[in-house]
A protein has these predicted regions:
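Active-site recognition of the HExxH zinc-binding catalytic motif
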Residues: 48-60
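Metalloprotease/metallohydrolase-associated module, dominated by Zn2+-dependent proteases
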Residues: 1-45, 61-95
């Protein structure tokens, strides 16, 4: 499946870019952009990396402080929960 090019957070559009980075991913609040380096992640890891950067985007937009260790724990935990419970995720997203 192809990497999405964008997402919305609190009604604001964000872009997803592929970039050469020092780390696997980066969240750039002033550009409303998540940057991912696919060279540094497997196909499964890129999903958790994207979710990790989205948690950083939420952190910035809600003006909260979460340690990098906890951002990682939250993103990995949410991804595992979504993967294990697709019916619940589908139910949550129904209008």
């Amino acid at each position: 499946m192809k990497l999405p090019k964008s997402f919305r957070l609190f009604g604001k559009p964000w872009t997803i870019k592929r970039r050469k980075l020092k780390e696997s991913g980066n969240c750039c609040h002033y550009k409303a952009e998540v940057q991912l380096d696919p060279r540094k992640t497997s196909s499964g890891q890129i999903k958790t990396t994207l979710l990790h950067e989205v948690v950083h985007a939420i952190e910035g937009d809600m003006d909260i402080k979460i340690s990098e260790k906890d951002v990682n724990r939250i993103s990995v935990g949410l991804y595992a929960w979504m993967k294990d419970n697709p019916k619940v995720v589908k139910w949550l997203l129904k209008n």
